[in-house]
């Protein structure tokens, strides 16, 4: 199957006691019986992700990375909680099996979930799809975000201890500023400028919804043969927040890979204007104001995240060998954001 996720032997920095894991899993659920085989998925820059085969059946394990980590980052418990809460909604998520916060098992918190079969591609141009398939898939991609933003977070159990309504951007700007400072390896004037500009330019108002925090094509599983999403992954940045912050993040490709809008229509990929119009239609909302702020905020946030990945790469704790390229990504995002203010 094209675009199948790449599975590799477990990298040396991410090995753990597989026999301890096997014994623990066998003690927790009856279906976790039989020989255990552990491999690792390539990617997952933040939380190492493993392919488990137990008695001939496939599962996925997500854990915190080893070593010193950023404050409030790598929240696998949050990932597990939000996916479990969304199980009975229209948002497509894998089934959760268990969460473990006992470090004596494999050294860090982890959870085990369903292995959803399908295609995974980080390439937003979807090279292995036809133009007609891209039209359908992007429409479903936007629809999934709207479904998430329509979820009543109180009714699914995410009202207590999951996030705080209001002041979303104030809190997020403070958080990513602190994490950038924690992980920075050189002085960047662009990042200093953004950390001063953003708090002074936050738009007023806005409702509170469940936000994914990292919603993009590469964090979805696409049906093996059909142009539709069957699961959304990587929820560690999910919280209660502003819907337009989430929307702007999943439009980041218009400021990177898809900057040439003239090339999009023949491919079957919506322009940014069409993307936003479709979202507003699904949400039954009016025209979006102050769009530049939301884009600048997300470029800054992406820069801070990239710097964190780069720092982990320098420290030898990253989940992928690509981590060492993220230092330049941080600079690129920050420079692009500064040109917009």
State each model region's role.
Residues 233-238:
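Activation of the activation-loop gatekeeper triad in protein kinase-fold domains
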Residues 1-32:
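Juxta-kinase regulatory segment immediately upstream of eukaryotic protein kinase catalytic domains
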């Amino acid at each position: 199957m094209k675009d199948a996720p790449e599975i590799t032997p477990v990298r040396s920095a991410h090995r753990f006691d597989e026999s301890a894991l096997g014994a623990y899993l066998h003690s927790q659920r009856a279906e976790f019986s039989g020989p255990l085989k552990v491999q690792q998925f390539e990617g997952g820059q933040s939380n190492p992700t493993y392919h488990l085969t137990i008695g001939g059946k496939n599962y996925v394990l997500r854990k915190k990375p080893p070593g010193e980590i950023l404050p409030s980052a790598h929240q696998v418990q949050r990932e597990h909680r939000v996916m479990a809460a969304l199980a009975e909604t229209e948002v497509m998520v894998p089934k959760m099996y268990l969460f473990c916060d006992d470090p004596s098992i494999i050294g860090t918190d982890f959870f085990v979930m369903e292995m959803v079969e399908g295609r995974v591609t980080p390439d937003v141009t979807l090279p292995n799809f036809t133009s007609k398939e891209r039209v359908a898939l992007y429409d479903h991609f936007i629809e999934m975000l709207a479904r998430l933003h329509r979820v009543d977070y109180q009714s699914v159990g995410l009202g207590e201890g999951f996030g705080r309504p209001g002041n979303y951007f104030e809190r997020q700007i403070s958080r990513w500023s602190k994490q950038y400072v924690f992980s920075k390896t050189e002085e960047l004037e662009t990042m200093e400028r953004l950390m001063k500009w953003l708090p002074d330019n936050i738009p007023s108002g806005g409702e509170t919804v469940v936000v994914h925090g990292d919603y993009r094509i590469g964090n979805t599983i696409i049906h093996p043969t059909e142009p539709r999403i069957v699961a959304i992954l990587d929820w560690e940045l999910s919280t209660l927040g502003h819907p337009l912050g989430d929307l702007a993040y999943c439009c980041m490709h218009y400021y990177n890979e898809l900057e040439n809008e003239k090339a999009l229509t023949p491919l079957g990929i919506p322009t940014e204007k069409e993307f936003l119009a479709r979202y507003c239609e699904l949400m039954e909302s009016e025209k979006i104001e102050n769009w530049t702020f939301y884009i600048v905020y997300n470029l800054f946030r992406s820069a801070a995240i990239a710097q964190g990945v780069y720092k982990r790469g320098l420290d030898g704790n990253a989940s992928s060998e690509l981590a060492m390229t993220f230092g330049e990504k941080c600079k690129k995002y920050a420079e692009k954001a500064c040109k917009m203010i």
